[in-house]
Each structure stands twice: as structure tokens, then as C-alpha cells.
């Protein structure tokens, strides 16, 4: 057909934008924390450390800085909230597997801590995969999904929309196809 085409995974692009110093900075907690869980309060207390480490951790997970594994495996590099509670068994689990695997595991716990904070304080529908999946899966009708679409866009929706707008402006497509991951 000789139709020029481009493909983009906006889900990955949103995660990479959100999980960056630039993406997390606007979420810097302001005001009181009395209505937050103990876990969220801990993350708030360590927020500056999350901002200092997020870009390097993402680069490590993308394979761009494998030497960071040694630092990540040191107890004082990553800020730690509730996802790190089960670390007693870490040496047993990773003792023979090596530093890279252990660092990837710790970096994943770190991202999951941030994700827990985002779900509690920013966007209850956030998740690393199948964002807002609950809306599509549990619906007997489209009423709940329709109501969700009528709400103001969340911070994460804003990231998605800005990436989409940039792509449309750059590519100027005549036709656009979108895959929607709802069952």
C-alpha cells in the first residue's frame, strides 16, 4: 500500500515521563500529611531523595548505566518505604544471583513505593500496566467509564495528552489507529 506509518507506545512514554525528576517534581507534597497513610508520610519525608535518584534508577533499569547496580545495592542509596519491608530474605534470594539482579529487584521495589504514593495521593487508577483497567473490566454498562471520562483529566492524563498532542503535531497523520487494552 505504500502508506507511511509510525507507531508509538504512549503507555511507556507516560511512565518514563512520570518517573523522572521532571515528572515527579510537580507532585512534591504540599501542606499537611495528617490524612495520609504511614507509608505515604514516609515517602513525603523522603521526597527529595526520590527526586535525586529517580533519573539514575530509570537509566539503570533501561540498561544505560549498569554500574549503578553497586550503589543501588547499598542500603543508603535508595529511599525505602513499605515495599522494602521484606528485605530480610533478600540476601538468601539473591546471594547466588548477582548484583545486577538484586539491584533490579531493589529498583523495582523503589518504583512500586512511588507508585503506591501516586495511587494514594495523585490518581487512584494509576498502575504500571493496564492503567484504569478496573473501569473497563468491571463494567456491566459503560456508565462508569463514561463518568470517568467526564471528570477533569488527572495529572497523569495530562502527561498522556501532552505526549499525544506532540506526536500529532509532529507526524500530522491523515489516519490514526489506537489500540485500547480493555477486555
Describe these PLM feature segments.
Residues 1-183:
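A short, structured N-terminal alpha-helical element that caps or precedes a catalytic domain
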